[in-house]
């Protein structure tokens, strides 16, 4: 047993300079786990509650000292003496201590910090790398890195309406080859933008964030960059979008403020269809607002046999919302963010529910990140086949990509790159 001996939380900073929670958990056998909690910029309304202090005179109200206090004074006394390896019992206890549907008392950032720290301590106690501890002997598939090389929306002061333009290097034999291709396209894109006289400053996730005349301009520049880097758009490298449409949806009018005009759902659906007919787009995240269940079901029915539709704000890594989507036929892919649901156990439950019902899963970072690399190990452990963790720039993003390189090397000949198989809905189109 990895009996918990001590738990201690402190306030640290994330990649945007905002406070977040760090938890250190020690076990009696000498193992130690570190839990670092990320934070999002565009967040779903149904996400688990992130506890902030609210004192505007300190960090603009974004301090997390109350969440730290919840760990040190409420959670720690209850979990000391428990087996850190009994992840479900530990997480269930913290959820029970909180007693709210959205972790609205202790805070998801408090609970997740302890949950992650226990996970790491247990892996160290067992003498296993995290991906092997979580996934057992079957974790062997390296995910396709969906790399956010152009930032817009809430990640870049709305340089474009669409929040993320990602490249997906699926047409390669190994993860390391795919990563190299993505990096080369990223650097080539910088030169393409410079030649056009555009700003090459970076957004929250390391992608370029120039102000564009239209959302489609970004796609054209990315296509140019893929070709200029010596790769074939569509065959080797596809495009994924995170529209994050809830960010420009008006609840009062039921319309989307898109490309400077008020657009209804029917227009947006047609727009997406035209877009995928013109560009090698294989995945669209949050094409409709987070409560637009009928619109989600409509686009999945119409285009779901040729495109991956990823639920982020819609599903918030919540098994209950995912089950509703399954019942309605809304979306066909789950975005996985640990802090959206707030515990390791619930995250794993969501992935398993998605897999059992034919949904793909894309493990994801947040815009406010730390050097933590849990999501890299998680993607391999559960063979999710996809990960998104920003551009190949900024240390907190690159750390995740580098961790996958390490795992690929450790796995040796048993490592398999997901490649085309990552995009189940697009298989017959990618085969062309």
From Swiss-Prot:
GO CC terms, sorted: cell surface; extracellular region; phosphopyruvate hydratase complex
Cofactor note: Binds a second Mg(2+) ion via substrate during catalysis.
Catalytic activity: (2R)-2-phosphoglycerate = phosphoenolpyruvate + H2O
Tagged with keyword Metal-binding: yes
GO biological process, one term: glycolytic process
Chain residues that bind Mg(2+): 242, 285, 312
Residue positions of the active site: 205, 337
Pathway assignment: Carbohydrate degradation; glycolysis; pyruvate from D-glyceraldehyde 3-phosphate: step 4/5
Binding of (2R)-2-phosphoglycerate, residues: 163, 337, 366-367, 388
Protein localization: Cytoplasm; Secreted; Cell surface
Pfam families per record: Enolase_C, Enolase_N
Main location: cytoplasm
EC number of the protein: 4.2.1.11
Molecular function per GO: magnesium ion binding; phosphopyruvate hydratase activity
Superkingdom per UniProt: Bacteria
Listed PANTHER family: ENOLASE (PTHR11902:SF1)
Function as written in the Swiss-Prot or TrEMBL entry: Catalyzes the reversible conversion of 2-phosphoglycerate (2-PG) into phosphoenolpyruvate (PEP). It is essential for the degradation of carbohydrates via glycolysis.
Family: Belongs to the enolase family.
Record-linked HAMAP family: Enolase (MF_00318)
Designated name of the protein: Enolase
Protein source organism: Bifidobacterium longum (strain NCC 2705)
Gene that encodes the chain: eno
């Amino acid at each position: 047993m990895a009996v918990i001996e001590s738990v201690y939380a402190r306030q640290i900073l994330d990649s945007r300079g905002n406070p977040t929670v760090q938890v250190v958990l020690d076990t009696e056998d000498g193992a130690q786990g570190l839990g670092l909690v990320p934070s999002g910029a565009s967040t779903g309304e149904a996400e688990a509650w992130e506890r902030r202090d609210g004192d505007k005179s300190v960090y603009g109200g974004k301090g997390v000292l109350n969440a730290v206090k919840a760990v040190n004074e409420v959670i720690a006394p209850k979990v000391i003496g428990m087996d850190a390896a009994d992840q479900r019992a530990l997480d269930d206890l913290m959820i029970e201590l909180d007693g709210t549907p959205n972790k609205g008392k202790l805070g998801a950032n408090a609970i997740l910090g302890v949950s992650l720290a226990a996970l790491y301590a247990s892996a160290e106690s067992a003498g296993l790398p995290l991906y092997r501890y979580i996934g057992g002997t079957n974790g062997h598939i390296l995910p396709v890195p969906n790399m956010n090389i152009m930032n817009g929306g809430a990640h870049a002061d709305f340089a474009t309406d669409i929040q993320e333009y990602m490249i997906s290097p699926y047409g390669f034999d190994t993860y390391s080859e795919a990563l190299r291709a993505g990096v080369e396209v990223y650097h080539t894109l910088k030169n393409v933008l410079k030649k056009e006289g555009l700003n090459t400053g970076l957004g929250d996730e390391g992608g370029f964030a120039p102000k564009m005349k239209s959302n489609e301009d970004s796609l054209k520049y990315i296509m140019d960059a893929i070709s200029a880097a010596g790769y074939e758009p569509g065959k080797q490298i596809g495009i994924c979008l995170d529209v994050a449409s809830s960010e420009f949806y008006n609840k009062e009018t039921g319309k989307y403020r898109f490309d400077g005009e008020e657009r209804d759902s029917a227009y947006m659906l047609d727009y997406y269809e035209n877009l995928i007919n013109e560009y090698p787009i294989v995945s669209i995240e949050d094409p409709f607002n987070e409560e637009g269940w009928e619109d989600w079901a409509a686009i999945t029915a119409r285009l779901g046999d040729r495109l991956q539709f990823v639920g982020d704000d819609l599903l918030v890594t919540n098994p209950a919302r995912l089950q509703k989507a399954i019942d309605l036929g809304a979306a066909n892919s789950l975005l996985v963010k640990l802090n959206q649901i707030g515990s390791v156990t619930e995250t794993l439950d969501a992935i398993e529910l998605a897999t059992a019902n034919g949904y793909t899963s894309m493990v994801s970072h947040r815009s406010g990140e730390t050097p933590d690399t849990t999501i890299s190990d998680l993607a391999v452990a559960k063979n999710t086949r996809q990960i998104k963790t920003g551009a190949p720039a900024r240390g907190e993003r690159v750390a995740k990509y580098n961790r996958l390189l390490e795992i690929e090397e450790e796995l040796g000949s048993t490592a398999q790159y997901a490649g085309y198989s990552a995009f189940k809905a697009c298989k017959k189109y990618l085969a062309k």
